[in-house]
Amino acid sequence: MNSKAMQALIFLGFLATSCLAQAPAPAPTTVTPPPTALPPVTAETPSPIASPPVPVNEPTPAPTTSPTTSPVASPPQTDAPAPGPSAGLTPTSSPAPGPDGAADAPSAAWANKAFLVGTAVAGALYAVVLA
C-alpha cells in the first residue's frame, strides 16, 4: 500500500472516530410484552324482588340561640411593615453582583468521558497523519 492510500485510510479512521465521539449515545429501549386478552365480563342480572328501604332515624336539631352582642371588627395590627418598596430597592442602589468569574461551570462536552477519550484517539490519529 502506498503512502497516499495509507494517509487516506488513517484520515477516514480519524473522521469516523471524531463522528463517533460527538454522537449522542442511543437511548435504551425496553420491550414491553403485548397485553393479554381478558375474558369478557358478564353482568349479573338483578333480583326481581327489591328489598324495602331501611328507615333512618334523624336526630332532632338543637335549638339555636341568637348572640346577645353584635360582632365587631378588630382593630388593624400595627406590627406588620407598611406596604411599599423597601429601602434596598431604590433606583440609586447598585445592581446585584454577577457570578464569580473563578467559579465557571465545566463544559458539558469535557465532562463526558467518552467524548474525552474519543477526542484523544482522534488527536492521536491526526498526529499520525501529519507526521
From Swiss-Prot:
Keyword Signal: yes
Membrane topology: Lipid-anchor; GPI-anchor
Signal peptide interval: 1-21
Keyword Cell inner membrane: no
A cellular component term, taken from the record's GO annotations: plasma membrane
Region (Disordered): 24-106
InterPro entries reported in the protein's UniProt record: AGP
Protein name stated in the entry: Classical arabinogalactan protein 2
The encoding gene: AGP2
